[in-house]
Amino acid sequence: MTVKLKKPKKYAVAKNATLLAAFGLIGSLSLAKANDELIKLEKEPGQWVMQNKNYANTRYSELNQINTKNVSRLRLAWSFSTGALRGHEGGPLVVGTTMYVHSAYPNHVYALDLTQKPYAIKWQYTPVQNSQAVAVACCDVVNRGLAYANGKIFMTTLDGQIIALDANTGKELWKMKHADVTKGETITGAPLVVKDKVLVGVSGGEFGVRGRVGAYDINTGNRVWLAYSQGPDEEVLLDSDFNKEFPQHGGPGDGTKTWPGEQWKLGGGTTWGWYSYDPALDLFYYGTSNPGTWNAEQRKGGDNKWSCTIFARRPDTGKARWAYQMTPWDSWDYDGVNEMILPDLTVKGKKTPCLVHFDRNGFGYVLDRRTGQLIEAQPFVYVNWAKEISKENDRPVEIPEKRTKQGVDTKGICPNSMGGKDQQPAAFSPQTGLFYVPTNNMCMNYEGVEATYTAGAPYVGANVLMYSGHEGKDDYYGAFICYDALKGKRVWEIHEHFPVWSGPVVTAGGLAFYGTMDGWFKAVDIKTGKVLWQQKLGSGIIGNPITFLGPDKKQYVAVYSGVGGWFGIAVAQNLPPDDPYAGLGAVGVAYQAGLPKATTVGGELYVFALE
């Protein structure tokens, strides 16, 4: 079926929308409506209106038609090609009877009418982009998905745009520029709508960019506020009560004084991961990436705040209520951007609003999401760069010989720069009170080298060689684990030959669905870890599965297939094995693990149902 592409408009806001905004009408009319609608829709089991199911990022569905007793009867219902190859991260949305599908670059968007068997394309949209973005994309040309609110679909593009489309027609409503590819800035993360604002981050921590989050009015596209990850307090947007309960976590002025000179201006701290929101507290949460450069000795002189940090901000103003830095003066590229899951857990006999975060540095953190109080922090993978997180000051107790240095090849650091897990989100089941976590099992050698900044050019400053876990002793590179965050213990685990780069969905049917990088889509019993069903797909899976009810009231499970991402870059770009340091170390470890012989590129959506 051929669909005519809609020609994008120039960067502009509709005149009448601007006029309404000038009179203050749009915000007052839509603020409650957009937020109330999403809060209602996220609770409907049959729909999937946010990338991680809900504001709390639990990736838990109450659907149970497909369960441990009948999942063996799961069969392919239909599939859909996205028209793009390379890595397919994130997942589709299902709003009402329409599924919204996205692709890797060039960032196609499709609306599929599910009332037609099996579907009909309602509309298709492909943005006009600056192709220079492909050259400055760090770790594949991925996109982690769309957002929905108030009859609109919000998308980001690799070249730094945030675009609003009419959800029913695909008509472009507005678009704004948020990132500048000439500086090495891109956008790979999914936006999140909170109230009448769409929140957008930025990628490019390997190019000396300065991380930030922006809020844009969902009706006009006008920017409401911009909050930087480091720099002067008025640009980081610290609230008057910032970290008041735990000043040892940092305070005013730290965005500059914990850096040497003006290095903070090239300080990374990008914001390309997942965002969550607590409507009751009116705070949204996200993490920041590694500081720039990877060579820590060029940043010597302090903690480099606020890189590798969890932020809690007020969505109306962007002001930070609290922040907690996980890896001070990062020396290993341990980005802190992974998802913030917001369960209420029983802590010392009391129900507590928590934030649970599985960090690249290998530690799983439990914090009180009201104040940033650290409740627990234990390794969820093998860690040898730090002994523990101190109960005295909430900082890692480092093992000195594992801190990297310029001109020194520090060997056997675990985990590697890809982390105990990367952005692939974990899931939480309220049935079990446990977390289901896709993990990596890899270590590395790391040598800092002096980096010189040129706008738009790589600003890495490290040579990294990666290999399997436990200093190369293991024969597997990943695992899917069930984890008790409060006890800091694994309940069960499934060893996978490749890193698990697919964020699971867990269901009331007692199942967890996830994919592997060699293309196996699996369903496991959440209580035991037993694999109950699996299906080989056309390409490696780095997408996050979803589940929904179709118009026929049947439960479906959907997932993208399309290998890529950081670990899969050798396959996605067809890179030779000659230089094991290429792809920031990914090429060597991918060939060592045998990924290029296990899968090839793709770009397909697969949808399954009971036969």
Curated annotation (Swiss-Prot):
The entry's free-text remark on the cofactor is: Appears to be able to bind and use several lanthanides. Binds one lanthanide ion per subunit.
Please give the UniProt note on temperature dependence for this protein.
Optimum temperature is 60 degrees Celsius.
Protein's cellular compartments:
Periplasm
Cofactor(s), names only, from the UniProt record = Ce(3+); La(3+); Nd(3+); Pr(3+)
- What residues does Ce(3+) bind to? E206, N290, D333, D335
Q: Which cysteines are joined by disulfide bonds?
A: C138-C139, C414-C443
Q: Does the keyword Metal-binding apply?
A: yes
Question: What does the entry report about how pH modulates activity?
Answer: Optimum pH is around 7.
A single MF term (Gene Ontology) = calcium ion binding
Task: Tell me the GO BP annotations in alphabetical order.
Answer: methanol metabolic process
Query: What are the boundaries of the signal sequence?
Result: 1-34
Instruction: Tell me the SUPFAM superfamilies matching this sequence.
Output: Quinoprotein alcohol dehydrogenase-like (SSF50998)
- The main location is periplasm
* Residues that bind Eu(3+): E206, N290, D333, D335
Give the InterPro entries listed for this entry. Answer: PQQ_b-propeller_rpt, PQQ_MeOH/EtOH_DH, PQQ_rpt_dom, Quinoprotein_ADH-like_sf
Name the source's superkingdom: Bacteria
One Gene Ontology cellular component: membrane
The EC designation for this entry is 1.1.2.10
UniProt keyword Disulfide bond present? yes
Q: What is its pathway?
A: One-carbon metabolism; methanol degradation
Q: Which CDD domains match?
A: PQQ_MDH
Leftover remarks: Growth of M.fumariolicum SolV, an extremely acidophilic methanotrophic microbe isolated from an Italian volcanic mudpot, was shown to be strictly dependent on the presence of lanthanides, a group of rare earth elements (REEs) such as lanthanum (La), cerium (Ce), praseodymium (Pr) and neodymium (Nd).
Tell me the protein family, please: Belongs to the bacterial PQQ dehydrogenase family.
Protein name per its UniProtKB record: Lanthanide-dependent methanol dehydrogenase
Q: Which organism is it from?
A: Methylacidiphilum fumariolicum (strain SolV)
Q: The organism's lineage?
A: Bacteria, Pseudomonadati, Verrucomicrobiota, Methylacidiphilae, Methylacidiphilales
